[in-house]
């Protein structure tokens, strides 16, 4: 029986109970699913066992128990809009579950569930009710036998709520649920009644009896291996055990909400605090898995969660960032909301979580300040039941960047309806306007209208550049200077050319485009040998998803529509691009294998001279880690792995472990998979045939480009060799300048640094003597000593150091000096005086006499003014000090 009812206690009790009953424990799988494009996030306990249920995963696992972190913020299961407005909805929650893969079925599953709720949780059986699917007489009889319940306590449900399926086809089966009765003081009716949506009867456990297979014709057949899938919401059962019927009243949420109220200084608006508490938890777990706020896919979901919470922070009239101040409750061992014991990733990623929450909330606050007053103004004219114009919603979105979902949140709270048609009409018009704009942007000012007309007359270009560096092709169309169609292009002309077939790779997937030559080989049906009609291809672009545009400069002769040309790419440049692209895949693989499996690609650039790879990670790579990456890369290069590509549908690719950066854009189309050893990625780029062709690899920089995002730049092949030679050249130049053999350079530099430091100390001492000789005035004001003086020829950094060296706790020091036609004041204030005056306060004090600027802290400040004459500054300061210390 449970002795404590904290969330962590309940989680441990559940897991221990099923482990004692022969189940294998599985830690929670990530929220971000690596091998299932059908789901944005893990949303149920069974997700990590999906391949076992369907027998795709051949591991011999008979039973399992887990506490699975889940997120429901999109698609069929989207609880985002309900969070804060109901007692039970969360974006992030934990699902306790026990599973059987052919080991046991209904009777033992029911037996285990009953024993847990009655013997371990010690729930009052009088408060429990059971539901079964109306056709599942077997489950009805088993519950009656095991629980000794009367027929009226076991309710048959006819709706599909009690029949679960994995999809339209595949494994499925009836469900049975355990409900808890909170009593007559809470509104609501039994399951299956019109009042069932009330809070009185709460489902605490769902048992799925997976015994059928549904065909595409809808027919059911008995599965040869029957399975059990159960789910118990940890937050819900915690509410039951803690005697509350509101999940937000459990210890975990109470701790988060208490911190929200404390930090914001606002205890009103309970809904706001609930939303903030829920969303902080969700965002923290997503960031811990490597997500950063963005504008697409999962990154956008994270941004949406943080921004929704930020809007509620704004409602509290709290002007600072709040979420990052609440998060530490989740990693504080003394807190009732402590989760880092079971989820250590929260502790590991704490700095990144705090930084991202703070930055994203700060950035969005500007949007809130600009857009919300405009929305509020529009809403003053509307009442519940009215419709907010789609034009207004679109203007807020398009002009101010105010998210539509937040607008809908706000109007929903007030009972105002959404002008869906008006909004989407505006969106469609904007898409039409931006289509050409996007085309122009993507083609660097190509005339969109001209190419739209051309597209009507020609099929997509046939790309053959994976296997061919040179092909013969026919010129179909030419556009001169981006504004007119031409039939002939002459020497010096800049022209964009469309051909029927091309070996030129157009920029895509981060890889730069091919360059090369076009040479006319046939004109008007006649072969031209040794043709002098040549064009340089300087860039290649793919527009309209299949029309390849070659940007050219006519080098000699002319090109005419209808010419047959030899289209030849710059093979040396292509090979460098291939080496860098394959190295990028291997770098991604190594980072995940050797540094952190949660690392995700955030962007890349594959050039011929270097590669750039952006990835999610919350700290700088150490020198040791960089060496590990380089060594592992060199191993893979030396092993000379073949690089293989194959075409398959997306699901097959994902089932085989391929990484897709943005699975949503692929839908169910065929995809190209690039396999390099154990690295598998969806990719349309060009690659080496064997890893040995990469030659060598060197990381030349590693840096931060945004909160939680790092960037690696590296070189391969000849460029890596050139880099080594340049570094070697610099080393020899340094050795020559310090007059040392190369092998002793560090020793010699260390010696020079020591000598330099000794000379610097002597110089400082000399300057200190100069200050003493130039005279220091000492005056007693109250109980303090005020030292001041006017200096010349002493650097300001020396003055600061002098003050910090001589300053004592009951002393104020002020020196001035003229530097570059400005008088500089440096002020020091002893520690014991900070309660009455700080060094930074002297910025205002001096500014009362002469116009000045500056800054500092409690102990030291620096102020600058264009007025070289000291005027009455010292006297004014003394007067101020008298009023401060004699008051």
UniProtKB/Swiss-Prot annotation:
GO MF annotation: an example: zinc ion binding
Task: Give the SUPFAM superfamilies listed for this entry.
Answer: Class II aaRS and biotin synthetases, Putative anticodon-binding domain of alanyl-tRNA synthetase (AlaRS), ThrRS/AlaRS common domain, Translation proteins
Cellular location of this protein?
A: Cytoplasm
Q: What class of enzyme is it?
A: ligase
Q: List the disulfide bonds.
A: none
Main localization, broad class: cytoplasm
Q: Name one GO cellular component term.
A: cytosol
User: Recorded E.C. number(s)?
Assistant: 6.1.1.7
Catalysed conversion reaction: tRNA(Ala) + L-alanine + ATP = L-alanyl-tRNA(Ala) + AMP + diphosphate
The free-text note explaining how the cofactor binds reads:
Binds 1 zinc ion per subunit.
**Signal peptide positions on this chain:** none
What is the superkingdom listed in this entry's lineage? Answer: Bacteria
NCBIfam families, per database record: alaS
- Family in the record: Belongs to the class-II aminoacyl-tRNA synthetase family.
The job of this chain, per UniProt, is described as: Catalyzes the attachment of alanine to tRNA(Ala) in a two-step reaction: alanine is first activated by ATP to form Ala-AMP and then transferred to the acceptor end of tRNA(Ala). Also edits incorrectly charged Ser-tRNA(Ala) and Gly-tRNA(Ala) via its editing domain.
This protein is called: Alanine--tRNA ligase
Species of origin? Ehrlichia ruminantium (strain Gardel)
């Amino acid at each position: 029986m449970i002795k404590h009812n904290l969330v962590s206690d309940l989680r441990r009790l559940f897991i221990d109970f099923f482990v004692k009953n022969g189940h294998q424990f599985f830690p929670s799988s990530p929220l971000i699913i690596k091998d299932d494009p059908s789901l944005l996030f893990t949303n149920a306990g069974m997700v990590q066992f999906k391949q076992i249920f369907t027998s795709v995963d051949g591991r011999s696992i008979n039973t399992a128990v887990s506490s699975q972190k889940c997120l429901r913020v999109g698609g069929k299961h989207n609880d985002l809009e309900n969070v804060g407005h109901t007692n039970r909805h969360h974006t992030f929650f934990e699902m306790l579950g026990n599973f059987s893969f052919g080991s046991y079925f209904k009777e033992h599953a029911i037996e285990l569930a009953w024993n847990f709720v009655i013997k371990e949780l010690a729930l009052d059986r009088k408060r429990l009710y059971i539901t079964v699917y109306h056709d599942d007489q077997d489950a009805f009889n088993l519950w009656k036998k095991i629980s000794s319940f009367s027929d009226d306590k076991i309710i048959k449900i006819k709706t599909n709520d009690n029949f679960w399926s994995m999809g339209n086809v595949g494994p499925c089966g009836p469900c049975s649920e355990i409900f808890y009765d909170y009593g007559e003081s809470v509104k609501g009716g039994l399951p299956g009644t019109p009042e069932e949506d009330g809070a009185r009867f709460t489902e605490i456990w769902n048992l799925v009896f997976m015994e059928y297979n549904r065909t595409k014709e809808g027919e059911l057949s008995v599965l040869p291996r029957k399975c059990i899938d159960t789910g118990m919401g940890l937050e819900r059962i915690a509410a039951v055990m803690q005697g509350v019927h509101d999940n937000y009243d459990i210890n975990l949420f109470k701790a988060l909400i208490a911190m929200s109220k404390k930090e914001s200084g606002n205890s009103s608006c309970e809904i706001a605090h609930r939303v903030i508490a829920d969303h902080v938890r969700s965002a923290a777990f997503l960031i811990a898995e490597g997500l950063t706020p963005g504008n697409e896919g999962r990154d956008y979901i994270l941004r949406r969660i943080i921004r929704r919470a930020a809007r509620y922070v704004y409602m509290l009239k709290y002007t600072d960032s709040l979420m990052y101040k609440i998060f530490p409750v989740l990693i504080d061992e003394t807190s009732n909301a402590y989760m880092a014991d079971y989820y250590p990733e929260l502790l590991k990623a704490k700095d990144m979580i705090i930084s991202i929450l703070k930055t994203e909330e700060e950035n969005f606050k500007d949007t809130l300040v600009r857009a919300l007053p405009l929305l509020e103004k529009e809403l003053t004219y509307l009442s519940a039941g009215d419709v907010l114009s789609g034009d207004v919603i679109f203007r807020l979105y398009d002009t101010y960047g105010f998210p539509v979902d937040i607008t809908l949140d706000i109007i929903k709270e007030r009972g105002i309806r959404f002008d869906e048609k008006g909004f989407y009409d505006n969106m469609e018009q904007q898409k039409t306007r931006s289509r050409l704009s996007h085309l122009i942007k993507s083609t660097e000012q190509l005339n969109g209208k001209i190419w739209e007309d051309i597209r009507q007359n020609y099929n997509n270009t046939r790309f053959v550049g994976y296997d061919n560096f040179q092909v013969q092709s026919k010129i179909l169309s030419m556009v001169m200077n981006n504004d007119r169609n031409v039939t002939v292009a002459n020497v010096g002309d800049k022209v964009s050319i469309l051909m029927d077939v091309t070996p030129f790779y157009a920029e895509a997937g981060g890889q730069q485009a091919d360059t090369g030559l076009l040479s006319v080989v046939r004109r008007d049906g006649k072969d031209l040998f040794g043709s002098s009609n040549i064009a340089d291809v300087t860039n290649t672009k793919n527009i309209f998803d299949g029309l390849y545009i070659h940007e050219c400069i006519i080098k000699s002769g002319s090109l005419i529509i209808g010419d047959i040309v030899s289209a030849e790419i710059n093979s040396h440049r292509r090979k460098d691009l291939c080496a860098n692209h394959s190295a990028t895949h291997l770098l991604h693989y190594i980072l995940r294998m050797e540094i952190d499996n949660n690392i995700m690609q955030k962007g890349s650039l594959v050039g011929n001279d270097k590669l750039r790879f952006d990835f999610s990670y919350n700290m700088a790579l150490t020198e040791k880690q960089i060496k590990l990456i380089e060594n592992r890369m060199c191993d893979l290069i030396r092993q000379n792995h073949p690089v293989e590509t194959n075409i398959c549908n997306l699901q097959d690719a994902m089932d085989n472990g391929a990484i897709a950066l943005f699975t949503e854009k692929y839908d169910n189309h065929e995809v190209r998979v690039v396999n390099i050893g154990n690295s598998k990625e969806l990719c349309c780029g060009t690659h080496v045939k064997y890893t040995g062709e990469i030659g060598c690899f060197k990381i030349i920089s590693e840096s931060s480009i945004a909160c939680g995002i790092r960037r690696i730049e590296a070189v391969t092949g000849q460029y890596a060799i050139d880099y080594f030679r340049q570094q070697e050249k610099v080393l020899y130049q340094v050795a020559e300048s310090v007059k040392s053999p190369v092998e002793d350079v560090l020793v010699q530099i260390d010696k020079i640094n020591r000598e330099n430091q000794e000379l610097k100390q002597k110089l400082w001492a000399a300057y200190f003597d100069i200050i003493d000789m130039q005279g220091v005035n000492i005056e007693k004001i109250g109980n303090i000593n005020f030292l001041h003086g006017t200096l010349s020829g002493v650097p300001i950094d020396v003055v600061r150091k002098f003050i910090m060296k001589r300053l004592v706790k009951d002393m104020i020091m002020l020196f001035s000096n003229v530097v570059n036609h400005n008088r500089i004041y440096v002020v020091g204030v002893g520690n014991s005086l900070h309660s009455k005056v700080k060094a930074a306060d002297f910025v205002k004090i001096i500014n009362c006499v002469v116009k000045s600027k500056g800054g500092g802290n409690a102990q030291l400040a620096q102020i600058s003014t264009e007025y070289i004459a000291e005027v009455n500054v010292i006297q004014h300061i003394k007067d101020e000090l008298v009023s401060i210390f004699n008051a």
